[in-house]
Amino acid sequence: MRIKYYNHHLHSSYIILNSNLYGVPHKDLILAALVASGHRKSSEIPKEDIQKFASVLTPEDLDAVRKLSVILQIAESFDRSQSSVVTGIDCDVLGDSVIVKTQAEGDCSLEIKDALNASSEFKAAYGKNLEIL
């Protein structure tokens, strides 16, 4: 089996679904796998996955998956350069905006720019504007 970096979201989903994580309810594994598969930029949860698990998923589950997928996308962006430059974040909710203040050791402009690519998905999921400093 070959694993391409650009499909890591699909490979992560497969690994989560097919790993025998004892003590984790099956539904939680499904939700985690869907979060992993849906976190790529402009990526939605694959419809075939939703259909495959429709019998155990509620609309609230799918909403939670969408929200968590956006958070995972932003978190992954905070290590875009793979140099661990972002060491922490603080978040404040002010009115219709969520303001994320990065703590960094060095220039994190690449990470911020990449994370801001999720602004529209964040707005759709949370109904708030995303600002990253």
Residue spans for each PLM region:
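Residue-level detector of family-conserved "landmark" positions at structurally sensitive sites
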Residues: 26, 132-133
